[in-house]
């Protein structure tokens, strides 16, 4: 299992990642880190806002400074905070996958839609980001059409 952490503790993106990782066959979520005012709280302390069941795992929120001993970091941080922390963690050797817009136009940080092209990450450093969410509903069907045209 690949040990993972989530940056961001209570928002919709963080909750979605928590849900997706709970029973994943490859990834083991071992840490959720958040803002200083949330450090020490449990993930169960936050209102669950998604339309599916809350994960059974309950994590004590750690400081962003304490993220360690993981191979992959899934970031759900606001862009201004992500700009600082994602770069720092990537420089420390962690593989960072971001949902923030901070690095979407930075050379050497690929924007990926894994459903379309997971090979886009090959040859890059250990930092990648997701596209803007409005792109996905258009890009994936267009990709499927081009692949089967």
Segments predicted by a language model, with ranges:
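N-terminal Rossmann-like NAD(P) cofactor-binding subdomain of oxidoreductases
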Residues: 1-149
């Amino acid at each position: 299992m690949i040990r993972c952490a989530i940056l961001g503790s209570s928002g919709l993106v963080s909750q979605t990642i928590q849900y997706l990782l709970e029973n994943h066959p490859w990834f083991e979520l071992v840490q959720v880190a958040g803002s200083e005012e949330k450090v020490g709280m449990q993930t169960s302390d936050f209102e669950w806002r998604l339309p599916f069941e809350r994960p059974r795992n309950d994590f004590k929120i750690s400081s962003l400074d304490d993220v360690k001993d993981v191979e992959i970091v899934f970031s759900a941080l606001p862009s201004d905070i992500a700009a600082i922390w994602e770069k720092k963690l990537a420089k420390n050797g962690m593989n960072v996958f971001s949902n923030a817009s901070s690095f979407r136009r930075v050379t050497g940080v690929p924007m990926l839609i894994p459903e379309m092209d997971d090979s886009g990450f090959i040859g890059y450093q250990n930092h990648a980001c997701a596209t803007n969410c409005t792109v996905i509903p258009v890009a994936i069907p267009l990709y499927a059409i081009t692949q089967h045209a």
